[in-house]
Amino acid sequence: YAKGSSSHARLTVSTQHYAFSVQAFVEVAEMYTGDEYEFTLRECRTGEIIDDVRTFRCEIGILVLGSFTSRVLDKAFPDANVVFTPLFDAQVHVFVGEHHPLAKAKILTLDDLEDYPRYSFEQGTENSFYYAEEPFNQIPHKKEIRFSDRGTLTNLLTNHIGYTLSTGVLSSEMHTGIVSIPPDTRGLPGSNGTMQVGYIIHSQMKRSPLLEDYISMLENVMRDNPFVHPYKH
């Protein structure tokens, strides 16, 4: 992992709203022993992540491909001269507060969720429908609450009766008071109940040692998680 050197070290990460990408970033920063460094992490909309990497503002972008969004993102990546590398597949889960009427269910259908507000990260106006972080965004819903930060999501889940769909990876701040339940995805076109998590790097970017350390830490953070299936590179 990262060791100190006399040069000014730099690591810049652009990521969707996932705690594992933040955890890996913090662990790399804590391990670095150099005298001069600049570490930057941006939690962004999907389009901003692609643009950050395209313009070299950030060295790496962390994002998720769903069965629906991948159709658009697979075209957007080469258009931006970025290359996507998968890290792991994660099982989709429904997240609700422990007080929620559905909290004790063993499995949930989308019909079960129909009367409850759906929480999602807002993606702005450009390609927002296709750039969603949450799976099954293409399925219409009559109650929507959108926001831009993970803190609001945690607050909503613990204090209200809505839900969100995401990977089965709970962040540390979401362990208390929040329940994850697998959804029944049978009958959903093009869905196998998983999301592909990976990273993008500009095709002309030369990877720094710190960037390599960060990628290794991402793999380590998720290696023992029972809800993910890592890719071997």
Protein language model features and the residues they cover:
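Hydrophobic hinge/microswitch elements
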Residues: 54-59, 123-181
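Central regulatory/effector-binding core of bacterial HTH transcription factors
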Residues: 8-72
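Short helix-loop hinge/linker segments at domain boundaries
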Residues: 1-14, 30-34, 77-84, 229
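Short, well-ordered beta-strand segments
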Residues: 10-16, 61, 95, 119, ...
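Beta-alpha-beta core module
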Residues: 79-85, 90, 151-206
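Flexible hinge/capping segments at coil-to-helix
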Residues: 76-118
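Short secondary-structure boundary segments
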Residues: 65-66, 98, 125, 166-170, ...
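Secondary-structure junction motif
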Residues: 21-27, 70, 110-139, 207-208, ...
